[in-house]
């Protein structure tokens, strides 16, 4: 059901404008780990910036049980996943929801698991194939799985010709740090981001090239391994691996130069923005900028030879989920900016980049007091968000 829109002015008043001019950061609270210092200027607490365009927030639909992802169909309807139930819906522009799409396999919806991302295949116009990630119940535990199938439209939509194209290994019993975002590259290869399962045996495997845990992997649409992957034909190494040393990535997107950006959740402190490159080690759990939730240390250092530094980090954390790099016509001042959903921060986080460095940060939509799970740019240039709650909402953001 479509409801009346609510218009929210953003960062108005002398204080916000002064912050933009004075160089003060958005985050002014004390860090969790004050002894950890940035490796270079601007790596954290960038200067506050302010969007000049007033924003209008329109609720398109509600009643989702912890929705997780949005993908646009060519006719501007949306696919929306519901995490714990394993339901996939088709939603019209005016908020009408289909019955759950039939043929989605059972999910393990406990904790951070369930039905996660969904994307249209690169050949969707002819094949009608969609791809999705989910936590698959398995003997001995569970694990992230990539599936694809043909979407059959109609009064009772369904999936036909289901195929499993990738299974994260090893299987473990854990409901945390699932990862799960999908990103198709222009060459049709598919990046899949994978968490390290949170538990100690999994955490250690983020540095183990014989494990998929804590990795970004790259596969072909049918699940085969691209011949130019960096670890092909290396004994004992998973050939799908593209990069490693990650903790829990819930945000991933390509920019205009086809660079892969990810935002990953840190522990207590140390959320990271990383520019992912082939064969690189991003350090977890050897280095980082956070600590255990108990306050105990994790890392002896924030730097180590052969390990990449984050482009940016947050302490305290924002709890990032969802990422789009804006390229539309409705918000010219946002072009090339990263827009990140914030769960614990209950905000839409905007980062301004220059030469692959963060030069400005903004927290938007804090008036909503909502955990933002997903951020997607629509075909017309509007932003579409999902709120992470038992009565989750699909919101549309346009200029007022």
Please annotate each region the language model reported.
Residues 1-10:
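Bacterial N-terminal signal peptides that target proteins for export
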Residues 9-19:
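Bacterial N-terminal signal peptides
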Residues 21-200, 251-254, 259-266, 316-354, ...:
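Acidic, Gly/Ser/Thr-rich repeat motifs that build Ca2+-stabilized beta-propeller blades
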Residues 145-154, 209-221, 276-277:
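Beta-propeller blade signature
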Residues 200-211:
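Acidic/polar, solvent-exposed loop segments in beta-strand-rich repeat domains
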Residues 237-272, 277:
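Repeat-solenoid scaffold signature
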Residues 246, 359-379:
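Conserved blade-ending motifs and adjacent loop-strand segments that build the rim/top face
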């Amino acid at each position: 059901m479509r409801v009346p829109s609510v218009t929210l002015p953003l960062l108005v008043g002398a204080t916000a404008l002064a912050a933009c001019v004075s160089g003060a950061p958005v985050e002014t609270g004390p860090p969790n780990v004050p002894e950890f210092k940035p490796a270079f200027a601007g790596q954290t607490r960038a200067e506050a910036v302010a969007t000049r365009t007033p924003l209008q927030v329109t609720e398109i639909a509600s009643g989702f049980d912890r929705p997780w992802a949005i993908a646009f169909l060519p006719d501007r309807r949306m696919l929306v996943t519901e995490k714990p139930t394993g339901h996939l819906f088709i939603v019209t522009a005016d908020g009408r929801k289909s019955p759950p799409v039939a043929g989605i396999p059972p999910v393990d919806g406990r904790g951070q698991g369930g039905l996660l991302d969904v994307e249209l295949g690169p050949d969707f116009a002819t094949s009608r194939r969609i791809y999705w990630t989910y936590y698959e119940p398995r003997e001995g535990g569970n694990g992230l799985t990539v599936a694809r199938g043909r979407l059959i439209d109609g009064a009772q939509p369904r999936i036909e010709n289901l195929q499993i194209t990738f299974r994260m290994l090893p299987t473990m019993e854990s409901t945390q740090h699932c990862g799960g975002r999908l990103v198709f590259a222009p060459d049709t290869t598919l990046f899949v981001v994978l968490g390290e399962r949170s538990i100690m045996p999994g955490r250690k495997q983020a540095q183990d090239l014989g494990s998929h845990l804590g990795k970004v992997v790259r596969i072909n649409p049918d699940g085969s391994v691209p011949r130019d992957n960096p670890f092909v034909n290396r004994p004992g190494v998973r050939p799908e691996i593209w990069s490693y040393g990650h903790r829990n990535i819930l945000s991933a997107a390509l920019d205009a130069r086809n660079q892969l950006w990810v935002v990953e959740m840190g522990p207590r402190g140390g959320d990271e923005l990383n520019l992912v490159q082939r064969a690189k080690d991003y350090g977890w759990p050897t280095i980082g900028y956070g600590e255990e939730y108990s306050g105990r240390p994790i890392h002896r250092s924030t730097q180590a030879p052969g390990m990449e530094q984050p482009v940016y980090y947050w302490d305290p954390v924002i709890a990032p989920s969802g990422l789009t790099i804006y390229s539309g016509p409705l918000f010219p001042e946002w072009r090339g900016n990263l827009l990140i959903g914030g769960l614990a921060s209950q905000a839409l986080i905007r980062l301004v980049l220059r030469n692959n460095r963060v030069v400005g940060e903004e927290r938007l939509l804090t008036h909503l007091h909502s955990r933002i799970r997903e951020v997607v740019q629509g075909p017309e240039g509007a932003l579409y968000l999902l709120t992470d709650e038992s009565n989750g909402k699909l919101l549309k953001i346009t200029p007022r």
